[in-house]
UniProtKB/Swiss-Prot annotation:
HAMAP family: UPF0336 (MF_00799)
Listed name of the protein: UPF0336 protein SACE_6876
SUPFAM superfamilies named among the record's database cross-references: Thioesterase/thiol ester dehydrase-isomerase (SSF54637)
MaoC-like domain residues: 8-128
Gene3D superfamilies membership: Hotdog Thioesterase
GO biological process, one term: fatty acid biosynthetic process
InterPro entries: FAS1-like_DH_region, HadA-like, HotDog_dom_sf, UPF0336/Enoyl-CoA_hydratase
Source superkingdom: Bacteria
Source species: Saccharopolyspora erythraea (strain ATCC 11635 / DSM 40517 / JCM 4748 / NBRC 13426 / NCIMB 8594 / NRRL 2338)
Amino acid sequence: MPLDQSFIGREYPPTPAYEVGREKIREFAEAIKDRSPLHRDPEAAKAAGYPDVIAPPTFAVLLSMKAHDAIVEDPQLGLDYSRVVHGQQEFAHHRPIQAGDRLRTVVHVDDIKARAGNDFLTVRAEITTVEGEPVCTAKSTLVARGTAEDPEGEDA
């Protein structure tokens, strides 16, 4: 079943606050093999001008993917998550994510396109502090395989 095009432009409510801790940053850095002391050593981070350790740039995926739950779990959209693959990811950082941040994410459906029998869902996650300071904009493409109707009646 094709995705509902009327969802283009939809914005979902902010996620609950996510507390960024040093340990979460360290674990993420270890998982992606980023050995920078800025992610592990508060003194190294302070010497570089940061108030505390900073997260690797891709740490934002934790927040953006969690925010995607609002879209994935929206029964009106009709997205069968068992058919979804992650197609693309981009980040635009306004400042580094750092230990002690309390962050919220608002997710938007920016586009839905049908191609070759698949639906391509473009999602934007705006990550801010709980006070509203912009931190990161994450854009993702989710591909729902075999859900779209080919406008020309053929699957390419």
